[in-house]
């Protein structure tokens, strides 16, 4: 009997030590050794007292996600106290960006943690990739305005590393076969109809008073009182000098056509804004759709970064739209995006960001730059497990009217690596003679040349020859459909699961 009691007490004490005092050092080292950043994993896992059993990889993934969420929530709470410590307008502007971006990070981590049964690993990888991108954007805002990082000490490398660990544990193959043929399948049938017909508007914007409201922002505000279903804002022909923020889900902008319905702004880094806040139109709410609209930033070629559109909207679609600016025109910030039959004008890094984005049947126009060099893309992937990249499929790359007379004196490149794992692919795209024979340009010395992924597949036109392209380890000339299939609409942005509902035409494969 005494032996039985002793064994029982020993088992209870072992159980208490395991549940009340954290994981054993052996467990911690074994599991954290599977991540790219074991040190913060070991530290925070050791500190954890509300432990749950780790028996398999899925258990560890859940705990890794929980650690990232806990640290991100702590970092977010600190941002609220930092506003009063800002010493000038530049520091305040950077702080406001970081506050918003940490809120979005916590939102995405919660979305990943509390995802519905229908949520796929691709969805989770998208949201984790976005959470990581948000933290990087906070740092970029400090750099834009020359604010030293010690002024805003919320920038926790631990949060970044913990999210990176969770990304590596989710392990999504790029060609996961979970979609049907047709449009990217995240587009619902009702949304598809909206894009193929003239939809009935919930509200009409008209400068002459013939609509319900005179400004677009008024219409967006009205949508907040309408519930969460698809809300169509018809914007009549005219030039609207506004800076628009769309934070609600399921908003649709419908205009009267490119060059007819024009939204214009002029904020820029040169004028004191961050790149993030310079956008004429900024969209965060998921499932955003825009059709038949021009969006401009008129800050000019010498005011540095000046964004026309910034989209961080998951499952967003832009159809027959024009984006016009110079440096950093189209900010494909994060999440899954699709552009069809759009025009994009710019000079330096004018398609940039860290979304999983496909541009299909679009016209890309390089303008006359201030410094005799154009770069079409600057993709911002910071982690090898982020499911992000810029895919340019069946588009046309040509010189804009202001560049044509001086084209021979300007070097125009397909892109350059903004971040360590930058990924950009051109597929079956017409490249005119403006493209430099080297094709691609360095960002700074040999930075990222071995870790980037740049590729070309069956492009045409006088600028498409790969004979004199760069010889970087990360550059690839693809020669077979199997090599490029992971970058199609169907696979790269899971287009077959959401695009059909928008009624935007798209090509799922090559």
From Swiss-Prot:
Acts in the modification of cell walls via demethylesterification of cell wall pectin. Residues 1-19 form the signal peptide. SUPFAM superfamilies: Pectin lyase-like, Plant invertase/pectin methylesterase inhibitor. The active site is at 328 (proton donor), 349 (nucleophile). This is Pectinesterase 2. Its main location: secreted. PROSITE patterns: PECTINESTERASE_1, PECTINESTERASE_2. Disulfide bonds join 342-362. It is an enzyme of class 3 (hydrolase). Induction: By ethylene. GO terms for molecular function: enzyme inhibitor activity; pectinesterase activity. The record marks 327 as: Transition state stabilizer. GO terms for biological process: cell wall modification; pectin catabolic process. Gene3D superfamilies: Invertase/pectin methylesterase inhibitor family protein, Single-stranded right-handed beta-helix, Pectin lyase-like.
């Amino acid at each position: 009997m005494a032996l039985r009691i002793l064994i029982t007490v020993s088992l209870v004490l072992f159980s208490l030590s395991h549940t009340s005092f954290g994981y054993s050092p052996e467990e911690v080292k074994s599991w954290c050794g599977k991540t790219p950043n074991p040190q913060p994993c070991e530290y925070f896992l050791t500190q954890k007292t509300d432990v749950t059993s780790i028996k398999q990889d899925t258990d560890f993934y859940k705990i890794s996600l929980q650690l990232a969420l806990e640290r991100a929530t702590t970092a977010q709470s600190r941002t609220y106290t930092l506003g009063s410590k800002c010493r000038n307008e530049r520091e305040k502007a950077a702080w406001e960006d970081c506050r918003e971006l940490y809120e979005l990070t916590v939102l995405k981590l919660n979305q990943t943690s509390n995802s519905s049964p229908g949520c796929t690993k691709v969805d989770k990888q998208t949201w984790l990739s976005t959470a990581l991108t948000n933290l990087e954007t906070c740092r970029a805002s400090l750099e834009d305005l020359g604010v030293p990082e010690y002024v805003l000490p919320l920038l926790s490398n631990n949060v970044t590393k913990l999210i990176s660990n969770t990304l590596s544990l989710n392990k999504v193959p790029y060609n996961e076969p979970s979609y049907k043929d047709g449009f990217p399948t995240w587009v619902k049938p009702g949304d598809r109809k909206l894009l193929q017909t003239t939809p009935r508007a919930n509200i009409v914007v008209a400068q002459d008073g013939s609509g319900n409201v005179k400004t677009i922002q008024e219409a967006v505000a009205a949508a907040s009182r309408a519930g969460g279903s698809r809300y169509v804002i018809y914007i009549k022909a005219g030039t609207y000098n506004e800076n628009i923020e769309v934070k609600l889900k399921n908003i649709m902008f419908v205009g009267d056509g490119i060059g007819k319905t024009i939204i214009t702004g002029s904020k820029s880094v040169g004028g004191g804004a961050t790149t993030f806040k310079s956008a004429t139109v900024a969209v965060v709410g998921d499932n955003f759709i825009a059709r038949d609209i021009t969006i401009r930033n008129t800050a000019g070629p010498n005011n540095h970064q000046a964004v026309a559109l910034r989209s961080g909207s998951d499952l967003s679609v832009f159809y027959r739209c024009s984006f016009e600016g110079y440096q950093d025109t189209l900010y494909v910030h994060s999440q899954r995006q699709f552009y069809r039959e759009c025009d994009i004008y710019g000079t330096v890094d004018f398609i940039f960001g860290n979304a999983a984005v496909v541009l299909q049947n679009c016209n890309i126009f390089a303008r006359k730059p201030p410094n005799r060099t154009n770069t079409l893309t600057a993709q911002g992937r910071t982690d090898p497990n982020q499911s992000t990249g810029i895919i340019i499929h069946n588009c046309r790359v040509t010189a804009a009217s202001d560049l044509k007379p001086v084209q021979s004196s300007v070097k125009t490149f397909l892109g350059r690596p903004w971040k360590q794992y930058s990924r950009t692919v051109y597929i079956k795209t017409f490249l005119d003679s403006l493209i430099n024979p080297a094709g691609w340009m360095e960002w700074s010395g040999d930075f990222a040349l071995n870790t980037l992924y740049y590729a070309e597949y069956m492009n045409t036109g006088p600028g498409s020859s790969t004979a004199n392209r760069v010889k970087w380890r990360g550059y690839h000339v693809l020669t077979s459909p199997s090599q490029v299939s992971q970058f199609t609409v169907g696979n790269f942005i899971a287009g077959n699961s959401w695009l059909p509902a928008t009624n935007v035409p798209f090509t799922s494969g090559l």
